Every structure is written in structure tokens, then in C-alpha cells.
Amino acid sequence: MPTVLGLETSCDESAAAVLRQEGDQLTVLSHGIASQVEEHAQWGGVVPEIASRRHVEALPNLVEHALKDAGLIAADLDAIAATVAPGLVGALMVGSITGRTLAALHQKPFLAVHHLEAHLASVFLADQPPKAPYLVLLVSGGHTELIRVDQRGEMKRLGRSHDDAAGEAFDKVARLMGLGYPGGPAIQAIAVEGDAKRFRLPKGRVSKPEGGFYPYDFSFSGLKTAVLRHVEALKRESEELPLADLAASFEQIVADVLVERSLRCCLEQGIDQLVMVGGVAANQRLRSLMHAVGQSKGVSVHIAPLAYCTDNAAMVAVAALRRLSSGVKSSSLELGVSARWPLEKALSLYGSTPPF
């Protein structure tokens, strides 16, 4: 029954969680998050220096409460895991140094976790997790990717955004509309009352050099520009902005694009299971549409529980537990952090020779 303490500090959420695994059963013994959303909202986005400072302040208390709520002491743990890449370097260092220090102090294995692998692992906290092979739609503030996971756990990216991630587009459009930060929850809140068919917005596509389009890739920068033009035109006409209709139209087109390309990829690649994870996976319109269209096309859809869509430490612990189950022993205590590191190289985070 391995028990792992997970730490997450890759961006603006400080988190600590303790999870235990018995066979295929995962139990969240404790799970705490200290959000910085309100502090960063006044700046319209995450300020890295502030984020790092708040992690330093919050993480020790989160670790203390995670162990206390789980009814454990550090000696009871089998391993300690922390996110080390990708993310804000200063923020990542707080979690990594904390995790490595605790591991050294209590003589426990340290597992360095890739942030995107942790998001992929979040679906295993659902009641009915998938069985490989499956396709993952990772959709968040920093990433929009389609990733195939095979029976051996190997990952291959089949599609990606060439500019803004979907979550980034939500933030930018919300700012254009004066809705504040973070954009996803703000847009969802008012879109409920809006007419999603009022404004025609583009489904951005990515052209191939030889002609045609990449079928599984995404582009959201043009969509953001289209919303801006509608806003400017309405202001020139001295009309009150129909915020609910704009929000609903934008939210619907993003959901349509994500669902259409994800399921097309499944069908053309012969995959009958789709996993959706990441912060944008919390969007209710997207969740409902993905389930409905997936069912109509014979694709089983698995979505991370709402509580574990945005950045959290439970998903870090799950990723670590899955690595332990696969035979991984530990990561080097000399391993640093990296702002960028491809998901395909996540396995390099384990072993005696650190990649950075």
C-alpha cells in the first residue's frame, strides 16, 4: 500500500496532497490548495515573482496540514513527489527544493513529476478510469494538445495549438470583454444566459506548407481577434456590449473545435477511448458536449473530476504512484527544474543522471 506526498507549485497554485494505492484503488487521504487567483487578478494574469513568494509562504503549512489530515507523519510515507517541469522556474524551485529536502531528511525516495503527466494522471481519480490505449485532450491555460497513450504508457503527441492555448484564449477574451481574471470561470458564469448562435466566430485551422490543413491541430489567436472586432464594432455603434451572447458564442466555438478535432483523431487513429484533462476540462459546456458527441460516435469519454482539473497536488501524487507501479525507483536529488521539457521525455526525470 504505497503512500505518497505530492507537491504542486508550477504556477499560481500551492498544493499538497497525500494519496495511497491499494491494487488499482486510489485513496485521497488529504488534499489542500492555497490559491493566488485574487492576488494575480489585479494584474490581469500571473506575476512570476509574486507567485514564487506566495509558494514559499504557503507550502510549509500545506505540507503540515496534509500529513495531519491524513493521520500520518513523514516517516509513514513511501515517497515524496513534486512537479519539476514545465512551469515558472522560481515557482517550480519552491516545490522541488521542499520535496527534495523532505526526501533527504526522512530518507525517502524523491520522484520528480512532469506537470503534463500529472494532468494526464488526474483522470485516474475518476470512478471509471480508462484503459490504454487512449487519446488524451490536454486543455489548459498553457497547453492544448492531443496525446496518444499506448499499453506501455508511452506517449506520442498527435496534435497541438500553434499559438494560444485554449485556456489562454479564455483569459484574453475575458479581458477584452472586461470580465476579469481568470477568464474561464468568468466567461462560463455569464455564458449560461447568452445566445451561443448570435455571433459567428471562426474555427481556426493551421495550414500545411504543401496545402491543406493539419487535421488535429488548433489555432485560437484568430478567434480572439474576431471577438475583438465584434467588441470594437459594437462600441463604434455605441451599443451596450451583449456580454452574455459574446461569452456564449465564444465558449461554444471553442467547445465545438475541441470536440470535433479530438473525436476525429480518435476515429481516424482507431482509438475508442478519449480522456480530457486540464483546467479547461472543468468547463461545463465542453464536458457535456464531449460526452454527448463521443457517445454518438461510439467513443468512451473519460473526464477528470472537477476538483482535479485545475492544478493540484493529488494529480502529482497519482503520477508518482503510477511511476512506482511501473518499476521506477526514484529521481536524483540533484535534479533541478525546467521551464520547458517535452512530455515525451518525462521518463528522463527518473534515474541517477538528471537531465537538468
From Swiss-Prot:
Chief place where the protein resides: cytoplasm
Cellular compartment(s): Cytoplasm
Molecular function per GO: iron ion binding; N(6)-L-threonylcarbamoyladenine synthase activity
Cofactor(s) needed for function: Fe(2+)
Note on how the cofactor is bound: Binds 1 Fe(2+) ion per subunit.
Listed InterPro entries: ATPase_NBD, Gcp-like_dom, KAE1/TsaD, Peptidase_M22_CS, TsaD
UniProt GO BP: tRNA threonylcarbamoyladenosine modification
Keyword Amino-acid biosynthesis: no
UniProt: substrate binding residues: 138-142, 171, 184, 283
CDD domains membership: ASKHA_NBD_TsaD_bac
A Pfam family it matches: TsaD
GO cellular component: cytoplasm
Catalytic activity: L-threonylcarbamoyladenylate + adenosine(37) in tRNA = N(6)-L-threonylcarbamoyladenosine(37) in tRNA + AMP + H(+)
Described function: Required for the formation of a threonylcarbamoyl group on adenosine at position 37 (t(6)A37) in tRNAs that read codons beginning with adenine. Is involved in the transfer of the threonylcarbamoyl moiety of threonylcarbamoyl-AMP (TC-AMP) to the N6 group of A37, together with TsaE and TsaB. TsaD likely plays a direct catalytic role in this reaction.
Matches recorded under PANTHER family: TRNA N6-ADENOSINE THREONYLCARBAMOYLTRANSFERASE (PTHR11735), TRNA N6-ADENOSINE THREONYLCARBAMOYLTRANSFERASE, MITOCHONDRIAL (PTHR11735:SF6)
Name assigned to this protein: tRNA N6-adenosine threonylcarbamoyltransferase
Naturally occurring in which organism (per UniProt): Synechococcus sp. (strain CC9311)
Record lineage: Bacteria, Bacillati, Cyanobacteriota, Cyanophyceae, Synechococcales
Gene transcribed to yield this protein: tsaD
